[in-house]
């Protein structure tokens, strides 16, 4: 970004009257817990300025679990850290409960950060202190009386399932238990927002599921707004309500998780979600050709169910419409946010229908269908 463009960005930031007009036209903005408006962040180094974020316009609703994904260097950490002002934006605004936190002085920033909890990939526990002491420490620093501290720590250790580990030291805990301590510590000041920065990336799959279950419970019981960044797409699928995709500091796609996962539009989204997709089995891919080599060659179809319909896919109707011998080579259907999302690779042999007819019939019953080629 040029120096001229940097100077112009603040001029594009909406005024208070413009924000009011936008909120009137879009009532959901009035409910936004966190809102980013034309947000930009530029770092200045020896090699010159590097734009980490640009023109970010985004609203996170109260009480939702909101995911941020993107490739390395996309700006995920920079974005999440502007919520508690650990990162100072170069331009634009961050509103929390409709209040511009960029105008806060140091005292208000301290108060803000107490209302925003944060957990990290590395648990940041003090090795010489017990579980109880690690959770209690922020309360002690804040000058909370001993009795209140004791009550709060006991409540939080029960919430995260560590009441029997209060005298243990971090070295005696598993990775999942350490993260539970981190979560308890992040909740000591009764925050309204919880930020999760790769909170499960150091954990095994089973422990990850237990931590996600705890975060889901906290979200439901306490009404917390949770904003998380992760490179694990399964985490977004399993816990988030909505997701935004970043690329080179820009938003390239956003929406409900079922929508983005079921029918990704941007190439970056498709690349990130590729590990969750099932591909053509190798033994079939090696035999694939554009034209049938024999009269009994099988046509391979790639069929997607995007969740756009409230009703699940009717596989029986699909197989009947295709006719002939239909074989499922790879894939399946799962439910994300009560929507049926599926990806099937089908082999169709012996059908009376032509290639174009088979494709048309598949598209009548599935939102997306493509011909991969022939085998045989």
From Swiss-Prot:
This is Methionine import ATP-binding protein MetN 2. Pfam families: ABC_tran, NIL. GO terms for cellular component: plasma membrane. Keywords: Amino-acid transport, ATP-binding, Cell inner membrane, Cell membrane, Membrane, Nucleotide-binding, Translocase, Transport. It is an enzyme of class 7 (translocase). The keyword Repressor does not apply. It catalyses: L-methionine(out) + ATP + H2O = L-methionine(in) + ADP + phosphate + H(+); D-methionine(out) + ATP + H2O = D-methionine(in) + ADP + phosphate + H(+). InterPro entries: AAA+_ATPase (IPR003593), ABC_transporter-like_ATP-bd (IPR003439), ABC_transporter-like_CS (IPR017871), ACT-like_dom_sf (IPR045865), MetN_ABC (IPR041701), MetN_ABC_transporter-like (IPR050086), NIL_domain (IPR018449), P-loop_NTPase (IPR027417). It comes from the Bacteria. The keyword Coiled coil does not apply. It is found in: Cell inner membrane. The complex is composed of two ATP-binding proteins (MetN), two transmembrane proteins (MetI) and a solute-binding protein (MetQ). Its EC number is 7.4.2.11. PROSITE patterns: ABC_TRANSPORTER_1 (PS00211), ABC_TRANSPORTER_2 (PS50893), METN (PS51264). Its main location: membrane. It is a peripheral membrane protein. It comes from Pseudomonas savastanoi pv. phaseolicola (strain 1448A / Race 6) (Pseudomonas syringae pv. phaseolicola (strain 1448A / Race 6)). The gene is metN2. Part of the ABC transporter complex MetNIQ involved in methionine import. Responsible for energy coupling to the transport system.
